[in-house]
Amino acid sequence: MRNAHAPVDVAMIGFGAIGAAVYRAVEHDAALRVAHVIVPEHQCDAVRGALGERVDVVSSVDALACRPQFALECAGHGALVDHVVPLLKAGTDCAVASIGALSDLALLDALSNAADAGGATLTLLSGAIGGIDALAAARQGGLDEVRYIGRKPPLGWLGTPAEAICDLRAMAAEQTIFEGSARDAAQLYPRNANVAATIALAGVGLDATRVCLIADPAVTRNVHRIVARGAFGEMSIEMSGKPLPDNPKTSALTAFSAIRALRNRASHCVI
C-alpha cells in the first residue's frame, strides 16, 4: 500500500502549452512530485533552463534516473510509440492525451499489449470534451447511436482538407466540411482528431461513430456537441471551449483534464 504521505513520483512526456500549464498547476502540490520530464533532444536545454535542477529532463525513457510511478503524456502522437509503450512495458501506469492517434488500431493494440506485459494501466484522458463518463456508462447497457458535431471558426480549419472545399477566409455562412466515421475524420483531420476519437472509444467505436465537422463564421470558439441514444435514454451535450491563455490553439479543458488525472492518482477518494 502506498505511503499516504509520500508524493507520487511523476514523469511528464512533453512540455508544450499543455505540459507547462499542468506543471504550474501541480508544482506545489504536496501529493505530487513531477521529478521527470521527457522532451525531444533539441528541447532539453530550454526545459532544463525553465525548470532547474529539481527536475530530471531527458529525451528518452532509457535516460530516466529511475522508473516513475506514473506518467502523463501531452506531447503528440509520436510520443505514444517512443515513450508510453516502453513505460507501460516497464510497469508504469500512464495517462495519455493524444487520443486521436488511437484511430490506428495497430498503435492501440501496441499500447494495450505493452500495458498487459508490464501489468500497468493505460488511462485515456477525456481532454477537451465532457460527458465521456456518461457515454462510457451508457455503453454498458447498449448504445444505438452516437454522433459528434464539431464547429470551429473558418480560420481554425486552415491547413486541413477544408481548404479545398471552401474559401475559409471569405465565408458568410456555415459549411459542412466533413461527414463520415470517426476513423475517417481522424485520418483526414489529424490535428482535430482527439475529441472524435475519445467519443468513439468511449461509445460505439471508431467506425460506428458518426462525425460532422463544420466551418462556421458565427462562432468564435470551438464548439463540441455529442448526441447519443440507447438503453439509457438520450443525451445531448454541447460545450464551447476556451483556449489556454498561452496558446489559442489549445483547449484549456484538455489541460484541466490532465491536471485532474494527476490529482486523482494521488487521491484515495476519486470522482
Swiss-Prot record:
Pathway: Cofactor biosynthesis; NAD(+) biosynthesis; iminoaspartate from L-aspartate (dehydrogenase route): step 1/1. The iminoaspartate product is unstable in aqueous solution and can decompose to oxaloacetate and ammonia. It comes from Burkholderia pseudomallei (strain 1710b). GO terms for biological process: NAD biosynthetic process. Its EC number is 1.4.1.21. Gene3D superfamilies: Dihydrodipicolinate Reductase, domain 2, NAD(P)-binding Rossmann-like Domain. It catalyses: L-aspartate + NADP(+) + H2O = oxaloacetate + NH4(+) + NADPH + H(+); L-aspartate + NAD(+) + H2O = oxaloacetate + NH4(+) + NADH + H(+). Specifically catalyzes the NAD or NADP-dependent dehydrogenation of L-aspartate to iminoaspartate. GO terms for molecular function: aspartate dehydrogenase activity; NAD binding; NADP binding; oxidoreductase activity, acting on the CH-NH2 group of donors, NAD or NADP as acceptor. NAD(+) binds at residues 128, 194. This is L-aspartate dehydrogenase. InterPro entries: Asp/hSer_DH_NAD-bd, Asp_DH, Asp_DH_prok, L-Asp_DH, NAD(P)-bd_dom_sf. It is an enzyme of class 1 (oxidoreductase). Pfam families: Asp_DH_C, NAD_binding_3. Keywords: NAD, NADP, Oxidoreductase, Pyridine nucleotide biosynthesis. HAMAP family: NadX (MF_01265). Belongs to the L-aspartate dehydrogenase family. The active site is at residue 224.
